[in-house]
Amino acid sequence: MTIQNIHDLFLKCSKVSIDTRKIETNSFFVAIKGDRFDANTFAKEALEKGASFVVIDNANYYVDERTILVNDSLETLQELAKFHRQFLSLPIIALTGSNGKTTTKELINVVLSKKFNTKATVGNLNNHIGVPLTLLSFTKETQIGIVEMGANHQKEIEFLCEIAQPDYGYITNFGKAHLEGFGGVEGVIKGKSEMYTYLKSNNKFVFVNLDDKIQSQKSVTFKRITFSQNDKSATVFIENVMANPFVKIKTLGVEINSHLIGLYNANNINAAITIGHHFEVPVSDIKAAIESYVPENNRSQLLTKGTNEIILDAYNANPSSMVVALENFIQLDKTNKSVIIGDMYELGEESLVEHKAIVNFLKNNSDFECHFVGKDFFANSIQKENFHFYHTFEDFIKFLSSVKLEHKTLLIKGSRGMALERTLEYL
């Protein structure tokens, strides 16, 4: 069966699924092998739950004529997504970067949806499985697709671009994320820049923050749409940016008051403004869209718990995002501040060095209480008044049980694996 034949069957279905727990009537189920399971074994169950067709790559689990047997289910999912993207032929905006991908994607989506029927990556489904699923969620009614791409190794962005074939691209930044897989910061720059390489070779467009030296230099010869706080020749000149704690931006003749905390979110907003402007979304609609966006999922959320005001930024962390979050917190005009920060994952052999750098940064720049949670921070323990180190989250909770934190402004930030949002239960 050709990929076109498979696509014809897919078009008869309402949606694609890889999880029998979420099967809906008339789904198109693709059995993907995972680390702990083989979804081929769920093919019969998928059909019983209402799937119209199932794709498998193990003949032992063939059910009936509704079963599509292929050599590799994952490769078929990816090829199907690529074929579907070409079939729809709609403009696609791709974005990647070390920090801020998901927030920027959501901002772009709310802005463009003021004028267009848009579809965007759900959550952070941004890998070799998530990107195909995103593309397969697009329909003939979709006018613009927004695809987030994540990577922790070389060649991943290149591969995802070959599937999604974006017409526009934006890289949020190049930072110290996934150093273990990329082999250092230079590896991060090389890996993320694979998007630039694809766009350049296919004569496509890039959105560029001219104030980011790496972005600016790498895109000089590209077809680019730009923004800047310093260069008035940029496509969109950002006149003024403030944050205390929420970001306010003046540009295109309006002042935009966001619900996003910290100057580190300013460029996420600026990118969405620039992309909206390029697609001729009225400035009043751009302003309304950004002002209506409220972050969730532990991303720069401002919460109140008891007597404490909390900046919850516990979805993820790396050295770059940790420093900018701490810099912003230090500058906040608040009294009785305290930070609760957790280990940063996937840093490889640089992990202890990077955790030590964060400890030293706070040692030199803070005069408030600091709680460090996790084995790599614990390995860099120092003696300093108001500094507290905990080997595990459970050790930290024991402390919280004995000393109540009250009337404080708190920053909570750590890698996803630390799940520091659990702290809220004990405040």
Feature map (PLM): residue ranges:
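Phosphate-binding loop of NTP-binding sites
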Residues: 63, 76-206, 210, 214-223, ...
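Acidic, Mg2+-coordinating active-site environments of NTP-dependent enzymes
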Residues: 57-64, 170-309, 334-335, 359-369, ...
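ATP-dependent carboxylate/acyl-activation modules
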Residues: 95, 297-299, 417, 421-422
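Peripheral docking tails and interdomain loops at the edges
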Residues: 408-425
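Active-site beta-alpha connecting loops in nucleotide-dependent enzymes
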Residues: 32-37, 295-298, 314-386, 415
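Residue-level signal for inorganic ion chemistry
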Residues: 27, 46, 80, 95, ...
